[in-house]
Amino acid sequence: MAAAVRQDLAQLMNSSGSHKDLAGKYRQILEKAIQLSGTEQLEALKAFVEAMVNENVSLVISRQLLTDFCTHLPNLPDSTAKEVYHFTLEKIQPRVISFEEQVASIRQHLASIYEKEEDWRNAAQVLVGIPLETGQKQYNVDYKLETYLKIARLYLEDDDPVQAEAYINRASLLQNESTNEQLQIHYKVCYARVLDYRRKFIEAAQRYNELSYKTIVHESERLEALKHALHCTILASAGQQRSRMLATLFKDERCQQLAAYGILEKMYLDRIIRGNQLQEFAAMLMPHQKATTADGSSILDRAVIEHNLLSASKLYNNITFEELGALLEIPAAKAEKIASQMITEGRMNGFIDQIDGIVHFETREALPTWDKQIQSLCFQVNNLLEKISQTAPEWTAQAMEAQMAQ
C-alpha cells in the first residue's frame, strides 16, 4: 500500500490543475496514508513528506498540506510519530525558511513526546530549534514567552540550571509585554526555581513567598510555594536579608501548618540549633539542596552553623575559638574561618583577636532586643488564645463578654 501512495504522489506531481483541486487530491492521499498501519504507514507518510518538500509542488499547496499533516501526527503511536517528525525535520531543513510555521508545530509535538518519555534534555533541545527571534515569521509575545518558559523548565528537570537561567532571562525580557496572567505565574514559578537551583536562596525565598499570596494560584499550590520559601530561607546565608525573611514567615500564620515550622521558630528566636534536630528537615530537601559546599559540609550544615554563630554573638560578648567550635559542633579552625568570613562580609558585627584566639562580638542595643522578645511573647499568647477558642468556643465567648462588661 505504501508503494501505491508513492505512485499516486508521483502521478499527481506531474499533473496540472487548480491549487484547490490539487490540494484536495493530495489531502485524499494523506488520508489514505494515515489509514495504513505499521511499516506501511511509516513509509507512506515519509513518501508524502518527500513530495511536499519537492520544489515542483507549489509552496501554497505544500504549506497547507504540511499543516494538515501536522494535525494528524499526534494521533499516531508515539514511536511512529517520533520517527516521522525527525524525518520531516531532516527533509525540510534545506527549505526551512519556507516552512517555519510547520517546523515550529512539528518541534512542539516532538518535544511533547520526549517530555512524556522524561527525556528532558532532548525535549528542550528540540524546542531550542524553533527560530523565535531569528526567523522570518513574527511570533506573538505569548507564544515566545511560553516556549522560553517550557525550555527553562525542561532544563531544570534535567538538572541544568545554567541553561535554564539563560532561557528564563530571555523570558524576563518578554514577560512585561504579556497580559496573560497564567503565563506571568508560570514565569514567576520558573524564575523562583532557577534561583533555588542556582543557590540564590534568599532571592528564591522572596519569589516563592510572593507566589504564596497570588489568589489565581490554587490554595494547595500557594501552601507549596510557602513551604519552598521557608526551606530556601533556612538554607540562605545568615545576615540581615535572611533575618527579615525569617520575620516575615514567622508572622505568617500559614507557616504553622508546615513541618519545618519548628526550625523557623528556633531561627527567628535566635536559638542554638543542634545537629540532631535537623534530620527530619534534611529529609524534606530536594536533591540540589543537599549538595555539599567547597569545605565538604552540606548547604544546610553551613546555614545552621552561620545561624548558630549569629545566635552566639547575641549571647556572648566574646568567646575563644575552642569554645566557639565546641558550641557549633565543628573544629575551632573552621569556626574561626566562618566567623571571619561573616564579619568581613558585614553579616555579623565583631572583630577577631588572633593572638589570643578570641572573637569579640559588638554589643547590641538592648531596646530592639527587648522589642523582639516582647513581640515574640505576644505572638505566642495570641496562638494560645486561638487554640483555647477553638477547643472551648462557648467558654471563650463568655469570658470575652465578662471582660467587656467590666
From Swiss-Prot:
Keywords: Acetylation, Cytoplasm, Cytoplasmic vesicle, Nucleus, Signalosome, Synapse. It holds the Pfam family PCI. The keyword Iron does not apply. Residues 197-366 form the PCI domain. The modification N6-acetyllysine is found at K25. One of its GO terms (biological process) is protein deneddylation. It comes from the Eukaryota. InterPro entries: CSN4_HTH, PCI_dom, PSMD12-CSN4-like_N, PSMD12/CSN4, WH-like_DNA-bd_sf, WH_DNA-bd_sf. Its main location: cytoplasm. The modification N-acetylalanine is found at A2. GO terms for cellular component: COP9 signalosome; nuclear speck; synaptic vesicle. PANTHER family: 26S PROTEASOME NON-ATPASE REGULATORY SUBUNIT 12/COP9 SIGNALOSOME COMPLEX SUBUNIT 4 (PTHR10855), COP9 SIGNALOSOME COMPLEX SUBUNIT 4 (PTHR10855:SF2). Component of the CSN complex, composed of COPS1/GPS1, COPS2, COPS3, COPS4, COPS5, COPS6, COPS7 (COPS7A or COPS7B), COPS8 and COPS9. In the complex, it probably interacts directly with COPS1, COPS2, COPS3, COPS5, COPS6, COPS7 (COPS7A or COPS7B) and COPS8. Interacts with TOR1A; the interaction is direct and associates TOR1A and SNAPIN with the CSN complex. Interacts with STON2; controls STON2 neddylation levels. Interacts with ERCC6. This is COP9 signalosome complex subunit 4. It comes from Mus musculus. The lineage of its organism: Eukaryota, Metazoa, Chordata, Craniata, Vertebrata.
